[in-house]
Each structure stands twice: as C-alpha cells, then as structure tokens.
Amino acid sequence: MDFANNPVIKKQIFFDEEGKAKIERSLCTDCLSCTKVCPAMAMKQQGKPMEISEIIDHVLRQELFYHHGEGGLTVSGGEPLSHGDWLIRLLKEAKKHRLHTAIETCGYASYEVLKEAINYLDVIFFDIKSMNDEKHKHYTGKSNQIILDNFKQLVQDAKTTKITARTPVIPGF
C-alpha cells in the first residue's frame, strides 16, 4: 500500500521533525479509515457499532449479575457527553427498562447536554484531572475552566443524581 499518497494519512496523520507519527485529531470524523491504513497496525477499532436496542438487550441479558446491587448501564469513553443526542436516547431507553444508569465523564462538554442527561442518570463519575488550570493545560492541552464550571453547575442541578468526583493520583502531575 502506498502510505505516502493515501488520502487518510495525508489528511489526518503526519510525521514531525523527529519522524514520530502524529494524528491531527481536529480533522478526525470517526470514520475509522486510519485503522485500515495504519502502517504499524497500532491503531485498531475496539468494540463494534451497536444500535441502542442491541445495547439495552445486552444489558438486560446480564441482569442476573446486577439484580440485587446497583449494576446496570455505565457509559464511559472516550467522552460520552461528546455524543449528546445519542447518549440521551440511550439513557432514556435504559430508564424505560428501569435500568440503573451511570456515566464516566471529564465534563469537557456543553453543559446543556449534561443538564439533560441528569434526568436519566443515577450516578455521575466526574473526573477532575487538576484544579490548577496551568497544570491542566500543560498535561491535557486544554483549560479546565469548562470542566470546573460544569461541575459547579452540576452540583447545584443534580438533586437526585449521585455525583462522585474523581482525581487521578499520578506522580509528578
């Protein structure tokens, strides 16, 4: 395969001065084409696309394992809030079946999505990597302001949803 002239690689993947492959994530459309042309085969699609009804059916078949506890449906990432419309549809369907619902989020999303999701969530695991904006920018490339603003608003708005704030403990971070 001619990787140098492959349109996916030319658009999304490039090599820096040191010869390291870099991905231009802002151009990513989640088409997964890069997984088909990765010369080192380091990029792979994990999981499989599923319809909401398939996900709910799968979770319901596992009910024996979580019936007496708080098991159910937990949506994690990437970032579930970045797929707002789909997430809301999934959570609504889960609630129709009286499933316990949770998400794991870093909170870097539009608050409007989070505000609507609250109505269908029992638990939110909210990851705050750093309270310090400079450290957060240094290690993630993004300000933490949206995250902290969303968390503050969430605490005010989520009357019946359990919120667990999590912070990773990483030496030197």
Predicted region positions:
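Short clusters of hydrophobic/aromatic residues that line enzyme substrate/ligand-binding pockets
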Residues: 15, 23, 136, 140
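Conserved AdoMet/S-adenosylmethionine-binding subsite of the radical SAM
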Residues: 53-173
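Short Cys/His-rich zinc-binding micro-motifs
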Residues: 28
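Iron-sulfur cluster-binding cysteine motifs and their immediate structural context
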Residues: 2-22, 33-48
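Generic recognition of cysteine residues
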Residues: 31-34, 106
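Conserved active-site region of classical short-chain dehydrogenase/reductase
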Residues: 2, 32, 84, 88
